[in-house]
Amino acid sequence: MVKRGCCHRKMVNHKGCLVSGIFLAVIGAVLFILAFALLPHLINQTTQNAVIQAVIVDSTSSQRYNDWAGQQSIENYYQQYFYAWNLTNPNEFLNGSIPIFETVGPFNYKYEFNFSNVTFQDGGNLATYTQSKSFIYQSDMSPNDPNEIMITNINPAYLGLMFQLAPNAELLDNMPAENLLIALSGCGQMRLFLEYLSSDNFTNIVYFTQNPKLYQEQYLNILKSLNGDEQYFYQQWANATSIPQKGNGWYGMLVSSVNNNNESSNISILSAKLLFNSSNENSILNQEIGSTLWINALLGDKTSITVLTSELQLTVDQIDMILNWWLNDFSKVYTESYVNEICDIPDISMLGVCQFVTGNALNGRSISNYTFLTQPFDQGPIEIPLLYQSIGIDVKLSVSVQQAYKSLFNESDSNSILNLNGLVNFLTASKSFDTFKQYNVTLFDAIKIIGYATAELYEQYNKPTILGLYEKYGGLIVTRSMDDWLWNCQDGILDYLGVDQPCALQQNNTVNKPSTIFTGQQDLSMTNQIFEFQEQTFLTCWNGSVQVEGFTESGQFPPLQSDPPQTMTLFEENVIRPVQLELSGDSQVQGIDTKRYYLVNNSFPISTTFKTTIPGFANLTDIQNLPIYVSLWDMYEVPPQYSSNNLQGLNQTYQSAQVPLDLEPITGNALYYNLKLQINLAIPEFSNWFSSNSTFKNMKSNVFYPILKIGQTATPSQSNIDLLNSQFKLIKILGFVPVIVVSIIGGIILIAGISMFAFGFKKLRQQKQQGYQAIINNE
C-alpha cells in the first residue's frame, strides 16, 4: 500500500482498500539498529575527545560519516526475523469453532540501510537525512523456505475493504458491508466485460456478424459487372492470385490472393457455392448455425472443423485459408470501416465500448446470445441497454461512444469507473447532480449506469464472481506463501476491483520521508535524540498533538555516561510514540561490560491520547485505515478476554515477550537488543459486515487475531568483538599509558610496551585513567 505519514487521513471509499503492506508499511520496516560504527576504528587518542570525535557526526567530513550513513549495515549483521501465525483449522473456524494457531519460523533477513540527501543545520547540531531500507533473505540462516511454506490467516486486504466500506454500508439501511462490496464490484465486472469486448476474439465475432451482409452487397456488384456469370465469379474467388481481368470490385474478394505462397486454394466451385449459400447451415453466411460452426473452428474446435471439412468438401488448410481471408482481408477492406461508422468511432479500438453502451456492433444482439465454445457470459446480457431490455426497460444512453470511452471506460484513466475508486467517485457525484457534468453524461445516463453496475449486475454477475474469487483466492481467510505474506502478495479481489496496491505486510527497498536528529555537537546528552520524524515535530494523528521525542532506534545513545540513567526514552517508529526503557542491572556482551535495560511493563496502556482502549494493544487503526493492533509477542500484557480466551496457541510469558537492550556506557553503543513486536488484526466491535447467508457469517466481532511476529536484532563481527574486548582490557589496565602506540606499532614494540608496563605497574595503577578508545557505533 502507499505509505503515508502518521497524520495523513484519507476518505474511506476513495482509496479502496487499502490493504496489507499497504496496510502495514511502518510496522517492521524500522529496525532497532546496533551502533557498530566504532568497531572498525583503532583507538587513536586516549582522551574523551577521541570518543566524542568517533561518536559525533556533524558534517560529511566527520570521522565516522560513512559508517553512520549506512556502510556499517553492510559490514555487520543486522537481522530482522519473522514468525508467522498459521491458522490450523480454517474450515472449523469458519463454522464457528475457536481458532487454533501455531507459529512457523523463523524466516531471517539481513537488513541494510542508507542515508541520502544528508544536510547539517545549526552549525552541525542537527542532521537531516532520507533513509532507504532493504531486506535480503538469508537462506543459510533460515530453517524454512518462505517460497515453499504456506500460511493461512486473516486477509488484511479483505479486512481493509470491509472496514472501509462499513460506514457507508450503514448509511444504506444498515446494509452488510459485504453486500456493498458485491454491489461495488460491478466496477470489476464491467472491466471484465470490456476486456473481452475489446479482444480480438470479440472483433472476429463482430466480423462474422457483419460480413455476410457486406459480402452479399459486394458479390452482387461484382456479379452485375460480370453480367451474371456466377461460374466465373466462384472460379476467380477460389483460385485467382491477382485481380481478374473481367469484372469490377475484386479487391478484398479473392481467397487465394492472401496466400503468401501465391498459390491457388484449389477450392472447388461446388464447395464455394455451398460455402456462400446462406440457407446451408454450414455456410459462413448462415447466421443461425453456420457462423457458430465457423467461430468454433476458428477457436480450434476439432468437431466443428470435422463437420465443415465433411459437409463443404474442404481440407483443413482450405478452411484456414478461408478464415484468414474472411477475417484479415475482406473484413479490413469492407467491414472495419462500416463498423466504425455505425459505432461512430475513429477506429476499431473503441469497438468494445460501442457494443457495451449501444449494442450496435452486433446489430442489437448481445454477445451472451452466441453459443460458441468458451462463451464467458451465460448469465444474460452484459451490454447496458440490452440488459435493461431483458427486464422490460427501454434504455438508450445519450452519451456518445467516444465520450463514454473518454470519461467512463478508459481503463488507463484513474477516474475510470472500471476501478473501485473511480466508481465510488462517480457515486459520490450523485450527491450533486451538476457534478455529473465533469463526466459529460446526463443525469439520466448516470443513474442508469449506476443502477446497471451496482444493482442489475448484482445477482447474475457480481455475486457469482465474488464467490468465485472467494473459492479461488480466499476472502477473509487466505492461504499464501510466506514470501507472499511478507513481500510479494497480490490479492485476487483487489485485482478484480482494479485497486492497484500491494497487500504484503512488509515493503522492501523503501524510502522514508526526511527525519532530523540532534547530533550531540552542542550537548552530548542530546546525541541521536529525534527532533523531527518524517517532517513532523508534532504528531497530529493522535488525540491532541504529541511531541516527537526520545532517542532514535539506531542503537546510539549519549557517550561518556559515568552514571547511566535509570530510564531512557526511545521514539518507537513502529507504533509512532515514545516508549520507556528501564535499567535492570549489569550485563555483559561477549566479555564487554554493559548495562541491561528492558522495555517497561505496561508499555501500551489505556490512553485517550493514543486511542488505546485495551491495555497491551497499540491501536493503529486510524493511521493505517485498517483495524490493526501492535502488541508484544503472543499478545503479552493483553487481558485474556481479548486474547487467550478467544484463540489457542499463545505463549503469554515474560521470557517470550521481554525486550532487552545492553548499553555500553562509555561509547553509548547498544551492543545487543531484541525488539519483539506482533501484528494483530481484528473485526471491530458491533460490526455489521456479513449477512446471515454469507460464507463468513460466523465471524465474531471484537476478536483479535495474531498475524505476524517481528523480531529485530543485530550481531557485530567476531573480529570486531575481539578488538573491542582487547582494547577495553588495555584501557582498564594501562590508564594513562598511550595505548594508541601499542595498537599501531608492530609486534616488537608491543612486547616492549608490555615490558614497560610490568616494570612500572605499581606506579601506574595510582594514576587516574583518562582516555577511552573508540569502539563500535551504529546509527
UniProtKB/Swiss-Prot annotation:
Q: Where are the transmembrane segments?
A: 18-38, 733-753
Glyco sites are at 44, 86, 95, 114, 117, 201, 239, 262, 266, 277, 369, 410, 440, 508, 543, 601, 619, 651, 693
Q: Which UniProt keywords apply?
A: Glycoprotein, Lysosome, Membrane, Transmembrane, Transmembrane helix
UniProt-annotated location(s): Lysosome membrane
Topology: which residues are Cytoplasmic? 1-17, 754-779
UniProt lists the family membership as follows: Belongs to the CD36 family.
Give Gene Ontology CC terms.
Answer: early phagosome; lysosomal membrane; lysosome; macropinosome; pathogen-containing vacuole; phagocytic vesicle; phagolysosome; vesicle membrane
Report motif location: Tyrosine-type lysosomal sorting signal. 771-774
- Coarsely, its chief localization is membrane
List the residue ranges forming a coiled coil, or say none. Answer: none
This entry's Gene Ontology molecular function terms read: phosphatidylinositol-4,5-bisphosphate binding; scavenger receptor activity
Q: Which organism is it from?
A: Dictyostelium discoideum
For this protein, the record's PANTHER family field holds: LYSOSOME MEMBRANE PROTEIN 2-A (PTHR11923:SF48), SCAVENGER RECEPTOR CLASS B TYPE-1 SR-B1 (PTHR11923)
Q: Which GO terms describe its biological process?
A: defense response to Gram-positive bacterium; mitotic cytokinesis; phagocytosis, engulfment; phagolysosome assembly; phagosome acidification; phagosome reneutralization; sorocarp development
- Name-wise, this protein is Lysosome membrane protein 2-A
Provide the topology term for how it sits in the membrane: Multi-pass membrane protein
Q: What highest taxon heads this organism's lineage?
A: Eukaryota
Pfam families, sorted: CD36
Q: Which residues lie on this side of the membrane: Lumenal?
A: 39-732
What the protein does comes down to: May act as a lysosomal receptor. May be involved in macropinocytosis and fluid phase exocytosis. Binds to the anionic phospholipid phosphoinositol 4,5-bisphosphate, but not to phosphatidylcholine and only weakly to phosphatidylserine.
> After translation, how is this protein modified?
Heavily glycosylated.
